[in-house]
């Protein structure tokens, strides 16, 4: 009985610890769990899509249900799965890579997570409250303004809440990388995952405000009767396209750049070579970020903007392939001549190269404005997009999860299960999407819930569906791997791969709450590798052992986010029910009173005294 009470108390305290944490490592786990959950939700929606399209005139889903599932699949995967899973790895790794004890603003870090989480929950509650959004993940104004029910309203309000969390996270990482680097960690000594996080965070800072403006205008149109996008009353639907895509295309680079950073960490470790062309890689990252804001109109070649606009954006789109090509060749030259160890993470990294190149080639094909009239709104675009996002972002996430899992949890994922999962996923991915290039060229439009027999589309769609089941099996095996590792996996040391090059591999696995007992002194690029080559057993400390200041946990980020969650329901049902307006004020009251409490209550954190630090933990082991 006593043991049961103790276990219950322990579970309760662990739950409270995660609800109130401001520790970047625990917030990384929260992002990983929430993002993983939404990834499974988006995957189930994808399976529904592929089952519906497995044969002509299938009745597995109705037209309306298909539109809702298709819309929520794209929205969930982009905003609620890929982004938070990348934030999980950023939170887990970036402070360690730069030799910091936490991010610049731990409280805001927690707030960013809870805003994302409540925004995602709000969006998915639409399934149970009258129907999900049904206008596609791009929610073009001509469709969304005339959508019945509240599905689009859930889309607009949910994305505004979660988008605010993303914007906060981007600002936080910018401040962290600028201000929290260890002594000697100059910009040109930053690991490339940190560099890509830095540039992606800058893109977030400039890309998300246009989306926020567009969502706000759509909210005003739908809930308050304005006409920004209604052409019948002087509005312009093309304004929505511009606002969405000037966010939407940088969003692709917000996703792919951190994945590039992951590959740039994984490949040198398992090729056992220094990354080829570090300076050119940094240049390419910055150039991709800059050019990413100059190509959004290639999504709008068929809207009638004219040949001059189309030509300018076509050239800019083709130009962005140049820095990407630089990165591809540098990764190949890093592998060339290396003593390559093919772990699961390395398999994902190596397979990414041909997969992503194929996605890039079809991207350049789509950049030809004249040809785009044939490709536009067909499955050719669907195939291109998924080759970039799955072949780039998802492969990067899977490589990063296998690579840094032991750093986050202290145990290595089972390699045999990991490799079987990789083979299933790789085969399933190419089975699903390669054939879609040809299905699209044969004329199959995207976003349609069925197709007629006798058009030559049956075989291609069936192959795509079979491939999707391979991918589903791979994800299930990955979940089995995670459970098996948590139960039976063995604990590992600071550098489980034995060839770690950067500072995260100098601390224990998982790291202590304070990360570094003494901040390390960085003597060059790949600082741990430098110390290993010099025969040193530990990093050179940059400071004497002293008391370590730590931030207190807080429940306030969760309460602030919950207040906006409540207010969103009031705004949604304001015109339907009398309780809508009071609920708005209650929700905003919760948020603003909590913010006021945060402002007036002094919270100076606490100190871990140097006498409490373990003597055997140097904090910066090599």
From Swiss-Prot:
Q: Which residues bind heme a3?
A: 384
- Extracellular side: which ranges? 1-27, 89-110, 179-196, 262-284, 332-346, 395-421, 480-552
Annotated residues for binding of Cu cation: 249, 253, 298-299
Which prosthetic group or cofactor does it need? Cu(2+); heme
Q: Which EC numbers does the record give?
A: 7.1.1.9
Q: Where in the cell is it found?
A: Cell membrane
Identification of the protein by name: Cytochrome c oxidase subunit 1
Native species = Bacillus subtilis (strain 168)
